[in-house]
Swiss-Prot record:
Misc remark: Tw12 allele. Encoded on the T-complex, a region of 20-30 Mb on proximal third of mouse chromosome 17. Naturally occurring variant forms of the T-complex, known as complete t-haplotypes, are found in wild mouse populations. The t-haplotypes contain at least four nonoverlapping inversions that suppress recombination with the wild-type chromosome, and lock into strong linkage disequilibrium loci affecting normal transmission of the chromosome, male gametogenesis and embryonic development.
Tissue expression from the record: Testis-specific. Expressed in the testis from 22 days postpartum (22 dpp).
Family indicated by similarity: Belongs to the protein kinase superfamily. Tyr protein kinase family. Smok subfamily.
UniProt-recorded name of the protein: Sperm motility kinase 1
Domain Protein kinase positions: 8-256
Span of domain UBA: 274-314
Annotated catalytic residues: D127 (proton acceptor)
Function: May play a role in sperm motility, especially in the regulation of flagellar function.
Top-tier EC class: transferase
Segments of skewed composition (Polar residues): 423-434
Catalytic reactions on record: L-seryl-[protein] + ATP = O-phospho-L-seryl-[protein] + ADP + H(+); L-threonyl-[protein] + ATP = O-phospho-L-threonyl-[protein] + ADP + H(+)
InterPro entries: Kinase-like_dom_sf, Prot_kinase_dom, Tyr_kinase_AS
Length: 484
């Protein structure tokens, strides 16, 4: 218990199952919110839920929920997973009524990508319902529940009846041995119907009537649907499983490939096998070892190191997309970065030679996880220093070793410069950075004659050790005199 609470702050309950609770928690190091499934160590239920955890450990796909860490105590097992910030597909459709075909297509393509990935891994879902699918704010789809999933071998037949009745395939309701992947295809048809119609295709007042409807495979399809979409739905919900297509075959259907035929990037892995040096280096400043980070990711240890890396990466990517705030935040206010109070700096900061080198991204280039980039129209650049440890008692100076504290990690957010070339042009007219320069504060540089007079006066005072400087420290940081 202490091991868990040392890393996470438990918040409210966000889900309740038959034998496990799902809690919202905050990662203390990064301030990132996560979902935590708490599994009591009861022999029967624990085995079933731990099998789901084993499946999640196998997965690494952008449309499948990511397991980040497993913490085991005497009484409970904690599964720390990424938090999906959005609504279930059921809620999404309820709010919209139904989706237009062009709205449903990108969501359904993500479902196909996830199911094709699972089937290639020898996993069948068996309970793919709108309640088990999340739609995030950016339109990304996530499959979140694999509680009824199982391994299958090619050609293997299953006998266990499980799933949600209105979404079950006819062969399951007839208590016949069934092929796992084919029942997932049927369920995809029911889900697609629900997305574009706003209701499920089979509905009856009793279980027996519902069973007869599903076995007969009879349902109504509105005329407003395109011919290609009607054909796809009929194909997915073919009552004979032998004639039902595979997910791979569905992915090349004309309705699916209409417009952009691009599926989610298969190389966009949630948990990379090779760490990014831009994240490894700052993690070293707060106590992590580079070799441990590499081993944890490559071997998928699901430990504290692996979780911290993934959450730091997620927060950095989120910061890259976050708009720049109008007012700078005081870095000394919040000891740990959080979603509420992340330190930011004013526009137009000048990076001096002694500041840590950051990763410079241009807003007209969108860098993908695979290293590819696409062009955008805007011409704006971001300085992304990555994850840095905030210096408390020292200020970066020329030709001095930088002292960093490991007790107060901090993630600096983006610094936007509207005209990148203006930085170089403005710095050419000034003298090079030296130990006598005044630190760059969020309020900006002194302007006008008075500002330069004050700046020169402070520099002269520091040249003479007997004359104390009138400058006071800002943001809780003290000045460090240059070495003689």
């Amino acid at each position: 218990m202490e091991k868990f609470h040392a890393q996470y702050e438990m918040l409210e309950t966000i889900g309740q199952g038959g034998c496990a609770k799902v809690k919202l928690a905050r990662h203390r190091l990064t301030g990132t919110h996560v979902a935590v499934k708490m599994i009591p160590k009861r022999e029967y239920w624990c085995k079933l839920l731990m099998f789901e955890a084993e499946l999640l450990m196998m997965f690494n796909h952008p449309n499948i929920i990511s397991l980040l860490q497993v913490i085991e105590t005497k009484k409970k097992v904690y599964l720390i997973m990424e938090l999906c910030e959005g609504k279930s597909l059921y809620q999404h459709i309820q709010n919209a009524g139904y989706l237009q075909e062009d709205e449903a297509r990108p969501l359904f393509k993500q479902l196909l990508s996830a199911m094709n990935y699972c089937h290639n891994q020898g996993i069948v879902h068996r309970d793919l319902t709108p309640d088990n699918i999340m739609v995030e704010k950016d339109g990304r789809v996530k499959n979140i529940d694999f509680g009824l999933s199982t391994h299958v071998k090619p050609g293997q037949k299953l006998n266990l009846f499980c799933g949600t009745y209105p979404f079950s395939a006819p062969e399951v309701l007839l208590s016949r041995p069934y092929g796992g992947p084919k029942i997932d295809v049927w369920t995809l048809g029911v889900v697609l119907y629900f997305m574009v119609i706003g209701k499920i295709p089979f509905d009856a007042a009793s279980i027996e009537k519902l069973r007869k409807q599903i076995v007969a495979g009879k349902y109504s399809a509105p005329c407003r649907l395109s011919v290609k979409l009607q054909h796809l739905i009929n194909l997915l919900m073919t009552d004979n499983p032998e004639l039902r297509p595979t997910v791979a075959e569905v992915m090349v259907h004309p309705w699916i490939t209409k417009g952009s035929g691009v599926f989610p990037d298969p190389c966009e892995e949630q948990i990379p096998l090779k760490p990014d040096p831009a994240i490894v280096k700052p993690m070293g400043h707060i106590g992590f070892q580079a070799q441990d980070i590499e081993d944890s990711l490559r071997q998928r240890k699901f430990n504290e190191t692996m979780a911290s890396y993934c959450l730091l990466k997620k927060q950095i990517l989120k910061e890259c997309d976050r708009p720049i705030r109008d007012q700078p935040m005081n870095p000394s206010v919040t000891p740990f970065p959080s979603l509420v109070d992340t330190p930011t700096f004013h526009l137009g900061l000048r990076r001096r030679e002694t500041e840590p080198t950051g990763l410079r991204l241009s807003a007209n280039r969108q860098v993908s996880v695979c290293g590819k980039s696409t062009s955008k129209k805007r011409d704006r650049s971001f300085i992304w220093p990555g994850v840095l440890s905030r210096p408390i008692n020292t200020t970066p100076t020329m030709d001095q070793t930088h002292t960093r504290t490991r007790s107060v990690p901090c993630i600096y957010s983006n610094v936007c410069t509207i005209h990148p070339n203006s930085i170089d042009e403005s710095t050419e007219g000034h003298t090079s950075a030296s130990a006598e320069d005044k630190p760059v504060h969020s309020r900006g540089w002194p302007r006008g004659i008075k500002g330069w007079t004050r700046k020169i006066g402070n520099a002269m005072r520091k040249l003479c050790c007997c004359i104390p400087s009138k400058e006071t420290s800002h943001l809780g940081q003290s000045r460090v005199c240059p070495k003689k």
